[in-house]
From Swiss-Prot:
Protein's organism: Mannheimia haemolytica
Localization per Swiss-Prot or TrEMBL: Cytoplasm
Annotated family: Belongs to the RTX toxin acyltransferase family.
Protein name (database record): Leukotoxin-activating lysine-acyltransferase LktC serotype A1
GO cellular component, one term: cytoplasm
Entry EC number(s): 2.3.1.-
Gene giving rise to this polypeptide: lktC
Xref: Pfam families: HlyC (PF02794)
Length: 167
């Protein structure tokens, strides 16, 4: 680890401290969510005039790890961050209103990707939904088809995981 690693970790931590959602989270959770992203270079940090303004990280999961993640968003091990090709946003931190800029930059960097995230409702942090985002060059029809395929595979895996019985 070098000085730039610690500067990066400090910038991301500062954004977490300024996020109404993240500032309540533990240092252990920060380490679990941020260090693998840095080590695998699976993050984007936006800086304006030397000040960090937005950050996101992602993991590329296989279906099995995806099922595990859906059941417990804090379950990822460092090795699982690069276990497959099913991209999930792990963190999205834009406490100063730069979420659209971060989204635009991600769409430019990954123009052909489908990316999913678990979004939480501010007043009901235990309640979330799966959202998906498409890269800038992916048309809506193709993106929807790909997303529907991912969702069908995930639903089947979850059904098998929980041994649901069809009535």
């Amino acid at each position: 680890m070098n000085q730039s690693y610690f500067n990066l970790l400090g910038n991301i931590t500062w954004l977490w401290m300024n996020s109404s959602l993240h500032k309540e989270w533990s240092c252990e959770l920060l380490a679990r969510n941020v260090i693998p992203a840095i080590e695998n270079e699976q993050y984007m940090l936006l800086i304006d005039n030397g000040i960090p303004i937005a950050y996101c990280s992602w993991a590329d999961l296989n279906l099995e790890t995806e099922v595990k993640y859906i059941k417990d968003i804090n379950s990822l091990t460092p090795e699982e961050w690069q276990s497959g090709d099913r991209r999930w946003i792990i963190d999205w931190v834009a406490p100063f209103g730069h979420s659209q800029l971060l989204y635009k930059k991600m769409c430019q960097k990954y123009p052909d990707m489908i990316v999913r995230s678990i979004r939480f409702y501010p007043k009901q942090k235990e309640l979330g939904k799966i959202a998906y985002f498409k890269g800038g060059k992916l048309d809506k029809k193709t993106a929807k088809k790909r997303f529907d395929t991912y969702q069908e595979e995930l639903a089947t895996a979850l059904k098998n995981e929980f041994n649901f019985i069809k009535k």
